Amino acid sequence: SCNFNLYQRIYSVNYIDKSEDINVDISTIFTLINNVDGYKSFLPWCKNSTIISNIDNIIIGEIEISKNLINWKFKTSNSYIKDKTIKLELVDGPFSHLNGEWNFKKKDNFNTQVSLYLEYQFDNRIIEMSLKPIFSSIMNSILDSFISEAFRIKNDKQT
């Protein structure tokens, strides 16, 4: 049973659960988060981001992360309902499991509640030891990064 507990601890499922009310309209924040192609232009850790396909409200996107001299890619299938939700599912990458969703709730014409729920598990202990601290810090700050960029876009529209 001791070994089992150790296994559980090492291969635990990791969760991100964040929500913010922001003074940005729903369409701006949804479009920003749904446009995987644009990530590389404002997320400092994102070396490359590509939309491989966008058919019937399902985007296959690939993100390349580069941080602390470590590079890796992962690919997700993102099924979306415009201005409502984006559901993420792992297609390929160093995870045994990754899925989650973004939800968008219109408060009024100028304010939106944005939430991200993500759960993930790495392929093996070695990968987890090298990638978990980086991925965890990225995912814990990703909502803030999107919000900052949404405010920049909003301010550009106003000038």
Residue ranges and their predicted role:
Residues 13-16, 63, 93, 106-119, ...:
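Extended beta-strand/beta-hairpin segments
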